[in-house]
């Protein structure tokens, strides 16, 4: 992402796309058969997403907004989000799932903060929304994936030093799939 978005990066991406289309156009027509199952199963099939506009789904529901408030985002895909306001109280959810994803806004800016994800009281991940390849876009990260389905209390807290930074959670997604790996 160091080459894009900028003028030289645009030219480079255009040449990549042009090459891809040329290769596809010149490739022999062959029918592709999908494999009967993914190698590692379907761990994220039927995922469910909650947002400020739809805070409850079958597998997950919002229980407390803490120091986060629902704000107008002004984008088509995510018109509202949970944004850290004043304080450090966690955004809380209850879920029955095997994996948890966080959808958040990231940017290449020192105004962006880090947040911690806790499952049943144990910290499982710290996510940094200040990323050098960020450009104020939605981004997702897998917080945790278990092999079995578990009841979870999920908490999202600002990391130490990020209490006054921009932390914008667009949604939380979960999936409930048993897996061997």
Residue spans for each PLM region:
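Conserved catalytic region of serine esterases and O-acyltransferases that act on ester linkages
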Residues: 8-181
